Amino acid sequence: MSKREYQVCSNCVMDTSDSKIVFDEKGMCDHCHNFYENIKPNWNPEGNPEELQKLIDKIKKDGQGKKYDCLIGLSGGVDSSYVAYCAVKKWGLRPLIFAVDTCWNLEVADKNIEKIIKKLGVDVHYEKINHDEMMDLQLAFFKSQVPYQDTPQDHNIFAALYNFAAKNGFKHILTGGNYSTECVREP
């Protein structure tokens, strides 16, 4: 196997320390191409109030006669916490909060979840991932030395959220994410 020549992107600081990075003929990396082609065209920091209001109205209409309008995945981090706050305080939605105990939760995240639930006056459903199965999966990832060691945990969180939604008839799921600080490379 030949060693790759060191190269830095002509547009950012990414380099060949990322073994999967690809450069075009001008030296721009695929991370930058992904940003300019997929993220930037859909990234609107100012928001689109009309579209947001249409979505809120649809969620409320679909939730008529039900205890909850939507399901919100809450990690206790900034993004999902802000979504929960907006859903209740700004948009007047009636969410059920969905939190996952992955066996690796930080104490601060768990405390944040409790504070948010209490302050917003919302119900919560806790899903506990099987500890032994999670440890076996993560040990297999460590031993195989694959990148993205968080894959078992991340996939379990979203699988639990979407399975719960499907089993319980939730039509709308709100999650928090941030294109500006997450997912430089999608797994």
Regions found by a protein language model. Name each.
Residues 2-187:
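ATP-dependent adenylation/nucleotidyltransferase module used to activate substrates
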